[in-house]
């Protein structure tokens, strides 16, 4: 299993993150608590400067490159959107060129947000895996630095949001976290272990992109088709082996949520909090609602991981 960041690592990462923005809020929303039938806290990662938690990992990844004197001329990576915005933000901060590969048909508004951060955007392939393979090829051809979607230096930054959450609401009994490439869920595990917290961590996958659920059940990486229409942040076809090695022994269990359940959660969160949640951002609430009967009397923490959904799609959901 890959080494998880220590408490000292996470505290140092927080100081890097806070050079760009303050700790995000977490609120106990009355209507969401009423809907869930128990104390419900939301961690608002949709309030970062790129509208998603990924920026934290981008900042610490580039900080580590700078500390090693290894900042490249150009970075290349692949994304469905939020990781790409993270890379664009951090690359611009350090004066590094950034090329991002997205699959064809990617979110129009996420693409626009990346371009606004100075990213050179390339559309290639029919899903994230094909975009990733093309990005690796481009990086090799150009002599550029390929940034993976899962890496220890990304993890230490992402772990800061769970460190914030568990310190702010120490009585949380169970938390739900969506799994895309795995950094968010692995960071929850890292923060829990670093703080010596007893919280149960429940992973959430799309029922239409089940590679992590299938791989955990099988004990090895299992590819699974991706057919989700809403949860592009969880649209992963092949689980990352390093992430899988961390998740498998430490998740309490994994919940699969359908697009219909995600859509209902997006509507509920907007009604209850007037915050916009993208599909992956609403998945944790969808999973908690699915398990509502078992949560009575527990303090439940949910990661609203991002709010970057195209307006026409969100209007259709509402």
In which residue ranges do the predicted regions lie?
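PLP-dependent amino-acid enzyme catalytic core
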Residues: 1-318
